[in-house]
Amino acid sequence: MSAPATRVRPAVAVMVAVADAADPGASATAAVAAVSATAAGAAEPEVADHAQVTELDSGIRVVTEAVPSVRSVALGLWVRTGSRDETPAQAGVSHFLEHLLFKGTKRYSAIEIAEIFDGLGAAVNAATGKESTNLYARFLDTHTEEAFDLLSEMLLGPTYPEIDSEREVVLEEIAMYEDEPQDKVHDVLDRAVFGGHPLGRRVLGEADVISSIPVPDIDAYHRARYTGANIVVAAAGNIDHDAIVELSRRHVEPPVADSNGESHDAPDLDGAQVAFQQKDTEQFHIALGGPGIDRADERRYALTILDAVFGGSTSSRLFREVREKKGLAYAVGSYTQQYADSGLVGLYVGTREDNVEEACGIIGRELASIHADGINDDELARAKEHVKGRMVLSSESTAARMGRIGKAVLFDIPLLTLDELLEKIDAVTHEEVAELAHDFYAPESLSAAAIAPNEERFRSALAPVNEALVAA
């Protein structure tokens, strides 16, 4: 069966069993609606108190974190490939391939895969983002070898026996997504910010590509991208590092490549743009955003604090002013995204037509305020405790630990201990946050996107944010 992932920014997941594994690429509107913390995929630095890393001759990197106090294991097989690595003729192949990993291998049928995982009491899932694909599971520590064998077989041995039926499933997922403007508007914003660059494409891809792409093209993409240098095996829980390394040697045998095949061009951004899609919706779904920082930028800790203050928590300025004081929205908040060589800062609000001018007026006022003045002492202190609390609570989940160490090694980000991470957050200064607010929350640098019934009213509502957007 298939279900949407929770995501703050589209990382698309296919649900196969119980959805209690940490979603490696969280979501835009779900987190914005709950206004929990940093938008996933955003600046969530990696925590690793006892992580060990080993690189195999095949180029695969194995990273583990032992948590002896638990009786479970979270295992993830990460691949450094996603929608950014596709050509327009391949739009959506990464996500389509992720679905097909569950649909049969040389040794197991789709039904057998489901039955084996059920028999192990495992929760299994997968997710695709713009720069990564992840196949992951949680299971009892007594089933580590069986789960490892099956996951690795799925990752590297798909035979595509059910491609026609799964093609229809993905087309239905795309159709479902078209009916979810609160999610789709973030893809509209990405196109406005990144233009024709691959980061501007949506992870789900295009229906015309999915309906026609042949098996040989999918298999060629799989063979080109699912290579040793692109794969990370990550495990957290009641495990032994050497045992996971040995299982990786025995079960994960991808083609060997000299490099991970990265040939990305950084996006050349053209300044603030406006993108609108007409749809007869009850609300105006509006997203604003502009260039951010890349994932290796040391300013990511300060940006996490800034995001928490501006719209990433229930005490944030946007949540307080738009929702709590005025009741103008149910879902409102901010988020950040970091990629290999670029990033995005964004915000979202969903509001009825009668409220759109007032809501955008408040957003424009808050943008101008934080851009000019930064944040105050109370906000800085509260945001630090908020972010640290989330990090500590998250570190108690083996699935979250696996996700963090896996992403860190996949993207060559230093592994930090929890204490080191907390020190990074504590060290953030007013000046750092103010500089980021000045650089990235300048109203004139933000693009605007909307899915709504009335373009003229949307554009006129943008005047308090940036008058130039009204006629852009």
Residues covered by each model-derived region:
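N-terminal signal-anchor transmembrane helix
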Residues: Q52-T54, V62
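Charge-rich, well-structured scaffold segments of protease-associated domains
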Residues: S2-S36, E55, A110-P267, F276-Q277, ...
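Active-site glycine/GP-rich loop and adjacent strand/helix microenvironment
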Residues: Q273
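Functionally critical, cavity-lining and gating residues within the transmembrane helices
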Residues: S315
